[in-house]
Amino acid sequence: MNDEKRTGRVTIPTDLDAVPETLALMQRWGADAIRDCDGTEFPAQLRDTGAKVYATYYTTRKDNAWAKANPDEIQQCYIMSPFATAAEGKLRIPLMQGLSRELLKVNDRDDIARWWEVVDRTTGQPLPAAAWQYDKEAEAVVIPAPEAFHEYTVSFLAYLIWDPVHMYNAVVNGWTDVEHQIPFDVRQPKTHQYTLERLRRFLESHPYVDVVRFTTFFHLFTLVFDELRREKYVDWYGYSASVSPYILERFEKEAGYPFRPEYIIDQGYHNNQYRVPSKEYKDFMAFQQREVNALVREMTDIVHEYGKEAMMFLGDHWIGTEPFGDVFASSGVDAIVGSVGNGSTLRLISDIPGVKYTEGRFLPYFFPDTFHEGGDPVREAKENWVTARRAILRKPIDRIGYGGYLKLACDFPEFLTYVESVCNEFRELYDNIKGTTPYCVKRVGVLNCWGKVRSWGCHMVHHALYQKQNYSYAGVIEALSGAPFDVRFISFEDVKNDPHVLDGIDVLINVGDADTAHTGGIWWEDPAVSSAIRRFVWNGGGLIGVGEPGGHQYQGRFLQLAGVLGVEKETGFTLNYDKYNWDEHRDHFILADCPDHDMDFGEGKKSIYALEGTEILIQRDKEVQLAAHDYGQGRGVYISGLPYSFANSRALYRAILRSEERRVGKECRSRWSPYH
């Protein structure tokens, strides 16, 4: 480490009662920017320190007087009731069962016959409005004559009467004496006009502010709590809380067809990122992105008019911005700041095109859930930094920062010392690598239904949080975030529209469970798509499949990539066929860097067997975990699961080299002889 003291590129939080601590840490950590946070205020004494001042700005809350005066323009969310079984006689379906009444209030103000939907889930058909009634006092839908032993659900609109992020912060921090902040809908006419005027008033009264840190814009990701204040449903990419009759009527005019609540509710799955998206949902996303970014531009233009920068927090009310989408570049946002949970979430920030600079808010957040007696913030900080550092070396963010209550952190001197070392190391790394282009060994394309719009966010339910069911897949994206590859995210629709999109790729990766958006589902029934991918490999490309790649039962195959990868899944349909290919070949190029020539497959996959001609690298109890297969001039590699670890990252690196090796020629292969 260079002993020369560098400063800058660091943002720290402050509060009214933390002025001396802020000044001390500015000096110690070399911070050149100060910010407020939710639940804190910026001290007047720090306005003239010479540091850049960030002001957290909420476009949708912190103005309950307006929200209460305009209850028709409070934000709304689509909710689905629990499944209810009809027995004999009429069926009553309570709407608020299992939901927080502090958070949600049924919207029966608007036309419920138009904006609600009762669905017979046994047939999949909606009931006509005349076939059900609403008991307002009981907040229940009544079906007088249901089909016996059919199941029914109700899709309805509910007002968000407490901002879910404010509710989360209140619950986590034990706030008991705060007014519930009501989120208002900036998209609607009265609030739209008021919000622009409100922003101007803020800028005029805060001349010392350099950066308006929008947290964020208009629509929160889907976040619902139950009656015990527990998180009930979360989708960091969810659009279910970006709705209102006003917005939906505008969508109908643009789309040219009637809106159905089912387009959002999606059988109760809410179009989460594992669902193969419908045409209607993709239409809605595209509409929302155009409308949201146009309104964002109105606000950033005002910020620029006052000579300030507009920064967007990548999270909270960010739905519709989608920085990897087609229209974000027109938003006028100067900078992006986001929470860094690991390497992939760092790339989620640093890869965003069209902004002047990016900033990563590192963990831990200075909240009591970590900073308490017996807490170990140093451990969390080390894990966070070491994991993210790999990705910084590939595509650096321009700044780092922290958030929360600074005084809490000051009670942990070892933590302050460790963060000081992180700040110094980040500045040294940045100075050495910014402006350079890292060497890329291969061009890798991650193939799924979402493509570039969900770049680096694959398999993420909530921001960077562990899920037993997907860590074996998220590990692939995490490994790629710090690997020497040019990584792109490609959709099946991209391949359908232009098969030549594969010409710029050396190796394709398809990872996930069968019939999900990550592996493709029904897209494999489109011969234009399946043949283009097979042609790509046959002509010398590489294909790596993880989990159940191409998993979709169709025309005698469960794994639609079985012919390429040389493996298939036993679902019972092929039990009658004997299998004889079980010999392992662990002394293989892919496993050369793995201890004992073995790997951690995480949850792995059951019942995978090899076809004839496939080279099994690892099988356990006659279930294939790792295999390689030649296909024309290309190669396929199958991996049952790949949680992130150093050894697994090396195995994936070698698998990518191996899978595309056959078409590169002896001259190129010789360059990699040290690795063989």
Task: List the model feature ranges, each with a label.
Residues 2-61, 65-100:
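Noncatalytic N-terminal accessory/assembly modules of large enzymes
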Residues 8-15, 30-37, 172-193, 276-293, ...:
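The substrate-binding groove and active-site-proximal loops of carbohydrate-active enzymes
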Residues 10-23, 38-41, 312-321, 477-501:
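A short, well-structured beta->alpha microelement
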Residues 11, 17-54, 198-215, 335-336, ...:
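Catalytic domains of carbohydrate-active enzymes, especially glycoside hydrolases
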Residues 46, 66-67, 199-200, 210-217, ...:
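Hydrophobic targeting/anchoring helices
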Residues 72-330, 348, 434:
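Polysaccharide-binding and catalytic clefts of secreted carbohydrate-active enzymes
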Residues 519-597:
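A glycine-rich, often tryptophan-bearing local segment used as a flexible ligand/cofactor-contacting loop or short
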Residues 610-623:
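Short, Gly/Ser/Thr-enriched beta-strand-loop segments that form substrate-interacting elements
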